[in-house]
Amino acid sequence: MNKVFDKLKPVFEAIAANKYISAIRDGFIACMPIIIFSSIFMMVAYVPNAWGFYWPDNVTNTLMVAYNYSMGLLALFVAGTTAKNLTDSKNLELPKTNQINPVAVIVASEISFVILSILPLKTGVDLTYMGTQGLICAYIVGLIVPNIYYVCIKNNVTIKLPEQVPGNIAQSFKDLIPMGLSVTAFWLFGVGFKAATGTVLPRWIIQVLSPLFQASDSYLGLALIAGAMAFFWFCGVQGPSIVQPAVVPIMIANTAANLQQYQAGQHVSHVLAMNTMDYVMNFGGTGATLVVPFIMLFAARSAQLKAVGKAAFVPCTFGVNEPVLFGMPIIMNPMLFIPFLATPIVNVCLFKFFVSVLGMNSMMYTMPWTVPGPIGILISTGFAPLAFVFVLLTLVLDVAIYFPFIRVYDSTLLAEEKAKEEVIEDDGMAVLASDTVSPSIPTGLTVATATDDDATHVLPETAPSAHGEAYFKQNEVDVLVLCAGGGTSGILANALNKLSKERGLKLSAAARAYGQDMDLIKDMNMVILAPQMESMKGNLKKITDKYGVKLVTTTGRQYIELTNNGDMALDFVESNL
């Protein structure tokens, strides 16, 4: 089985690292604060309805102003952020002295999107497709405009002014031709498209893709989405980074439609909403692993699983399940393949049954993915009475699915630990080795530097410090830790910052989700890339090489140990400077 996954992994990594998929994913992530912020006003306006309290109409309308003019313009913002992220990738292919202006690209993309999306009315304009219903069109615009700029800048199709002209003025004229070409191209396309179809592009896209929207809400569609995320992760590639860009427009549109149904007093019926992925499919992280650390904590007999359970139950509660994925491990572990794939599928099909058959309201609010799954389900469904039953039943089913497989795996590890102890005792060594037994996880780390090209060095896990703490007391060192969602990277950065403060060191660490790091990298001395983002190493190395920053990657087990041991994390940084 592992040989098959080893062959598939490079293909999945190439998909995840594709610059266009990355631009869509990172462009959406950049707009998440808008979605969460606007949802706060929406929840204040409508969550009290669950307890029979209704605001006066003027209060509700006032609260919804913030929602309507943030989420109502989401596609406009996404067009800009998607274009910006693709521009950053394109700039890596250009000389440092001849770069695309990201601000100009954002402006051109947003103008082009508005031209394609607004429907003129007799009095005013229709802004329907500036929000969630225009997301696919926004992605299209955000991916095309940077390429127009790239062709113009690369081939010097720009207006050049004398050297005596100030740089900011010269840049404005340099951007004139690519901006003019971009806006004019979309204007001509919009005019021709409307003449041919009688409607604007976003509306036409929704009409054409409506069967796909409906299919994604079916049992089969939901199972494929949930299973695909788990399958990719099992192969070692961050699943949501591949699946999410394809389904985000559907999830956001469904969430908005659900809210409209609720406001109209109708049954909230769309199953695939934003938080369905976060709280149902990924109940405690990809693979629905919320119950896994608790099973290990209370039922495991092997030292390895007991230790992982102890370290993982808090992060998993908040949807950060890397300690489980890499600590057990689940990734590439045939013993845990079936429950890891089956549990999220069972969860989402059960959710579909509760919504479609039992009449429970689906999710109409968008909460941060780090909210514990049971709490997030209750809030997102507006505290629907059946949601309480669903949460309890989901917990029971997840335990029932995972428990027998974990028990078998635990027995295997326990036997290995006992065998190891016997060997040590036979050699006359009074050392208990069970805590360090990890036959399926290699140790060591890989370091890629700006002078290293594609070569890598494998260092021992306990590499000696190159400088000692005295170095950090005399020199400022900035470290950036990157992971998929900012969860484990935050834990590691906090551990480094805490020790730095306690010992008076000039070491500063920052944490980001991958894709939110471009502006920080140039000011860093080191970037630590979490193992779940290994597929992005090639793209990231181009950026770190550009700024002469050291890029360091770790194995899964070592990364988890670093997040749980501040001294080890500090030694790790020291040994790589």
Curated annotation (Swiss-Prot):
The active site is at C483. The chain crosses the membrane at residues 27-47, 63-83, 100-120, 133-153, 176-196, 219-239, 280-300, 326-346, 386-406. One of its GO terms (cellular component) is plasma membrane. Gene3D superfamilies: 3.40.50.2300. Coiled coil: none annotated. The phosphoenolpyruvate-dependent sugar phosphotransferase system (sugar PTS), a major carbohydrate active transport system, catalyzes the phosphorylation of incoming sugar substrates concomitantly with their translocation across the cell membrane. The enzyme II LacEF PTS system is involved in lactose transport. Its EC number is 2.7.1.207. The lineage of its organism: Bacteria, Bacillati, Bacillota, Bacilli, Lactobacillales. This is PTS system lactose-specific EIICB component. The gene is lacE.
